[in-house]
Amino acid sequence: MAEVSEAAASPAADSEEAADMHGDILGLLLSFVLVLFFIGLSFIVVKSGRRLFGDSCPEVARKVVHIGVSNWFFIYCFVFETDIWPIVGLGFFTLANALMNVTGLLSVLMGQDSRTRNWGLVQYPVSIIIVILLKHFGLGDMAAVGCAVLAMGYGDGLASLVGKAVKSKRLGSWTKKTYAGSITMVCVTMIVVILMKVFIGGVSFTGTLVLKAALVAVFAALVEAFTPFGLDNMSVPIAIFLVMRFV
């Protein structure tokens, strides 16, 4: 009887593995489409947006990629079936970003001088790989991954744009972050945390959740402001992911 049970279970297991593989392949394809779409959109901004954005056009183009690519989280959450293939895909994008950055191609696509280096866009997928690994080893859940990725994408991206568009003082001589940018970071991160906890984590919307989200948002803004050497694309997502254990 045991042999019959094992034989019956084998096709079911094979079918489940095949379904997982199909989800992972679709996830990889959608990941490439997403990245190429936002790179193409940023290129359009570079070529056609100077009249609208002026000298800020390269920065806007860079943030189009920064914000847009963060939506990859939804592919990871709803399409991918395992953690290994998202990490493989992110590893590929890390190497591709690094190569384009070293050659200056990435800067040209962003409308900048070819000698400019955008290591932040290289750090971005590395930080997501680390966050996924931390989740894989039980140090957080899917909602925490969403908070980390989307707060970095939307929070940091919009904070940078608002910080440059709105004249306000710097937080201090030790940072380039402004009050306007940091307030934007706090507001956007707070919204992201609430949405992720409610819709991904299944938590009820309460005053306690709002308070915890506000504390996480302030913490994220402080990490961003105090991170040296432009490494906030690494520090912010990882810090948010880890602190979400207490939310």
Which sequence ranges carry the predicted segments?
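Interhelical loop and helix-boundary elements at the membrane-water interface
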Residues: 3, 11-37, 43-87, 95-246
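Luminal/periplasmic acceptor-recognition loop/helix of membrane-associated glycosyltransferases
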Residues: 6
